[in-house]
Amino acid sequence: MSPLARTPRKTSVLDTVEHAATTPDQPQPYGELGLKDDEYRRIRQILGRRPTDTELAMYSVMWSEHCSYKSSKVHLRYFGETTSDEMRAAMLAGIGENAGVVDIGDGWAVTFKVESHNHPSYVEPYQGAATGVGGIVRDIMAMGARPVAVMDQLRFGAADAPDTRRVLDGVVRGIGGYGNSLGLPNIGGETVFDPCYAGNPLVNALCVGVLRQEDLHLAFASGAGNKIILFGARTGLDGIGGVSVLASDTFDAEGSRKKLPSVQVGDPFMEKVLIECCLELYAGGLVIGIQDLGGAGLSCATSELASAGDGGMTIQLDSVPLRAKEMTPAEVLCSESQERMCAVVSPKNVDAFLAVCRKWEVLATVIGEVTDGDRLQITWHGETVVDVPPRTVAHEGPVYQRPVARPDTQDALNADRSAKLSRPVTGDELRATLLALLGSPHLCSRAFITEQYDRYVRGNTVLAEHADGGMLRIDESTGRGIAVSTDASGRYTLLDPYAGAQLALAEAYRNVAVTGATPVAVTNCLNFGSPEDPGVMWQFTQAVRGLADGCADLGIPVTGGNVSFYNQTGSAAILPTPVVGVLGVIDDVRRRIPTGLGAEPGETLMLLGDTRDEFDGSVWAQVTADHLGGLPPVVDLAREKLLAAVLSSASRDGLVSAAHDLSEGGLAQAIVESALAGETGCRIVLPEGADPFVLLFSESAGRVLVAVPRTEESRFRGMCEARGLPAVRIGVVDQGSDAVEVQGLFAVSLAELRATSEAVLPRYFG
């Protein structure tokens, strides 16, 4: 447990600023709070004295890896360096704010962000996942937006590992319980199983919010005399030290047991009321600046608001409503109790602000005010326990240039190619391979998980189930909508971090494009092992550069993101897992492209893009041989842009009736998923001379399966030829068939495919 949570409730002497100045040699447990020797010395230099116990707690959480980005900041600057003015044109808020905000036209803006809650979700899976959803939702609320949807990227240990059942069950129930209670549709995501995540599951939650552009709010405190109001839930002992104890350190042999008190406890019904309360406060023009309380609690909210503003701030910490008796100042300041917000309000609007809160039965208290100075001063029953320059807490923490070194094992890993593995040749062998992949935890149906989420609440979900990207209607009068997708591949990123990050970007970009939407912006969550490992830092720096360069090539900006380090147990790190989220815009959701076949009688099936013999890092290599080595598929971002442009035009002109991107499992998996989604069979005729195994199972990037109405085949083929996009006819949709047939090789009934796919997760977790 956190040293903060172990401090006595009552001490003989309150450690005030005055007391600290007169007791310079008093021992302090800075190491237990996660601070290094040089960091503690720097705090003393900043203050000109030793810090009080409360100041020490504040600096320790705000200078943690989770809050300060001290190991990643120097590398994350590359995102800004590679973002052109043209890419910035549509951004209303970017990196550094609670969430990025993008202009989508017609006066509308969309804010979206993905964040991790990995470590808490291993310690206490239900609350860890639930509060992960709650935290990202409040980030979106703090921008002035109404949250409209969530997504999740989940990584667990092997499906048959004993602890995976505990973690998955809690995480899925936590996500569903919180999101469903908020009335937010869960419109997509991804679930991956790999032994490397056994002690370090990844729970990355994304939230999307919508606002009118004039309703944008930012996190800053300005105007001397303006009041600071804390509103929402009471403050308790839950979550204390979460950012420094859980999110900024590795698990040891003791695992999670000693860290349980650091997990927050969520109340989705309080948050649901808080959303409506915030929206009414915004509509009434009652808020100058606002910040949610997440990691580091009031330490973060007060220091960031003051640092981003043009003055100082005073806080009466004993005014904070508590739900635990005899909390110390440090505990109140660092508590991560959920469902709380902090607003800057003009004195003339305080009564109106409090009246709105009373209407919604939201507890609200004036706890301080903005000053014309340059200090953040916090008192406890009239005595000063914090007196610091806020920028040194929030924005000028330590920045490290960690050692970076390509792992000695990388060459051997890349030389271990999958070409040595035995491949299926006959029709029976190919059929068995298809069923083996479909019946593995890696490619089986996720219905067991997704059916625990409400996908269509609020009535604006247009695409969710079976779709590559989730789609929402934003404006009922015009049909304007958005599409969102998140993707990652730790296996590819291990083989080549630069290319792996670009492959994740390319797939998320392509998943948005196949819905008919135009990709416009990116968010990310970078999940890696310990930054103190030079090999991990090499993976991280390569992935950042790959993602930034890829966004520059595609012409879409990174609007914000999150870094999660220390995802390892002892010396065993997770696969490097950069999660990429892409936002797209569509002018009318009625022209969306679904995944399922059979919308039109006798559709022609066409494969767009080039197929190469690329199996290194593939699901086929993983399932059939437990192999991971070689080089990932080639990334061609110019081809991805071309593919997206063709799909957008085809959607606008009604040339395509269904589309599905090709990724894990290749063409065979895409065909099966589209056939099952449409409950319609099809007949595949492979091009003469093609290697059936390569064409069916290769994971080459930049490819899409499309269904084209018979009447539009020549037009669509002509458009592809005119733009230089390879398009090959590979079969037809057979509405009278109940099977997927690969002519001359094998056939599998839809019933067998569905049974194989849907039986897997219930077998492990039901």
From Swiss-Prot:
Q: Which residues bind substrate?
A: 116-119, 138, 264, 336-338, 564
One molecular function GO term is: phosphoribosylformylglycinamidine synthase activity
Q: Show the coiled coil region(s).
A: none
Q: What is its main location?
A: cytoplasm
Q: Which GO terms describe its biological process?
A: 'de novo' IMP biosynthetic process; purine nucleotide biosynthetic process
The active site of this protein is located at 66, 117
Query: A Pfam family matched by this chain, by name?
Result: AIRS
User: A cellular component term (GO) from this record?
Assistant: cytoplasm
According to its UniProt record, which reaction does this protein catalyse? Answer: N(2)-formyl-N(1)-(5-phospho-beta-D-ribosyl)glycinamide + L-glutamine + ATP + H2O = 2-formamido-N(1)-(5-O-phospho-beta-D-ribosyl)acetamidine + L-glutamate + ADP + phosphate + H(+)
The UniProt entry, under InterPro entries, shows: PRibForGlyAmidine_synth_PurL, PurL_linker, PurM-like_C_dom, PurM-like_C_sf, PurM-like_N, PurM-like_N_sf
> Which pathway does it take part in?
Purine metabolism; IMP biosynthesis via de novo pathway; 5-amino-1-(5-phospho-D-ribosyl)imidazole from N(2)-formyl-N(1)-(5-phospho-D-ribosyl)glycinamide: step 1/2
User: Where is ATP annotated to bind?
Assistant: 69, 113, 524, 561
State the UniProt keywords alphabetically.
ATP-binding, Cytoplasm, Ligase, Magnesium, Metal-binding, Nucleotide-binding, Purine biosynthesis
Subunit field text = Monomer. Part of the FGAM synthase complex composed of 1 PurL, 1 PurQ and 2 PurS subunits.
Q: What protein name applies here?
A: Phosphoribosylformylglycinamidine synthase subunit PurL
Q: Which organism is it from?
A: Mycobacterium tuberculosis (strain ATCC 25618 / H37Rv)
What gene is behind this protein?
Answer: purL
